[in-house]
Amino acid sequence: MHRPYYCSNRDGKKSDCTGEDSEYLRVGDSELGMPGLENILNERGVDICLWGHKHFYERMFPVYNNQTFYQTLNVYHNAQTPAYIVTGCAGNKEKHALYADYIPPYSAVRSEDYGYMVMNVYNATHMHIRQLNAENGALVDNLWITKSAGYRPGVKSTVATSHRVDKEKLMQINLDSDW
């Protein structure tokens, strides 16, 4: 998809991923009979959603209705909600977008490097995603999305309770994980 509704960049003085246009995409407009994309993606059991528009890389923890569903940093197993990745860092004449000083709880990994994504879908239960630096080939991000056979993600009628974790600790534990 093109325009993300979760990200942590700043456009001017505010993040344009939290503005009115993004909310309209995310939750829809009941008066116009337009459903929000977030409910549709969640109800259909989507595992991952890739976005562009912003000129950087950012991977989110699984998130729904601004509620973060933490997983380990490099493995999302049986995630209840989609994981979102903004991957618009191939480069452009306007240079990179700037990150907000505040890092929202749903933000797992951010990079301003020019780069590209390599995605391997092995079967119905295993997907491996790597983000690489275009200039030197360095690994920027490494994620496995796995699920048990027959598992169907999706938060049904209420948002489940999430818990806060120390993302720095997760990063140390999972940085070298190559599953």
Residue ranges of predicted features:
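Metal-dependent phosphoesterase/phosphodiesterase active-site architecture
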Residues: 1-50, 54-179
